[in-house]
Amino acid sequence: MHLDFLNQYFTEVHFAKGELITRAGEVENYLYYLSDGIVRFFYYNPLTDKETTVDILFSEQFCLSYTSFVKREPSLLSIEVLKEVTAYKIGREHLNTLISDIHFLEIKVGILEHLLIEKMQREAQLLLQSPEEIYRTLLEKDPKIIQNIPLKYIASYIGITSQALSRIRKRIF
């Protein structure tokens, strides 16, 4: 994203490793553009006391609890910083005033298209590939995840236990 655009409409913010950008149960008020860092999106199930990682984002991506942001409802997921983040944020109200700008409208449509395509690809992957195939795909197409994310989060992202991931890794390596 162009730095001039970011500086004009967005505010620079920093988050430390382990910090929650968005907390489940709170309404999302900001759209973030990750300039640097890594975050994970996860759901926490209090009945099983288990976290499930559903997405991992790196630099140069937009980040928010989209449903909460749009519907003004408490977020069902949390967004946690895995590697220190530098981001640019814009509030909901300010964002709405920008939508009248044709250039920004093009950006918003691009963001929505990107989010929808990623969601559909992720769903297809989980439904059509085995955990081992998903892990091999990550190794080939997204090695940043393997290199930068703790194995317990990778296992959760794939939908398996850490022990099952360990067995997959032994077979591969």
Tell me the role of every PLM-derived stretch.
Residues 18, 29, 33-41, 59-60:
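Glycine- and acidic-residue-biased ligand/ion/polar-headgroup-sensing regions
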Residues 42-56:
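Interfacial loop at the N-terminal end of multi-pass membrane proteins
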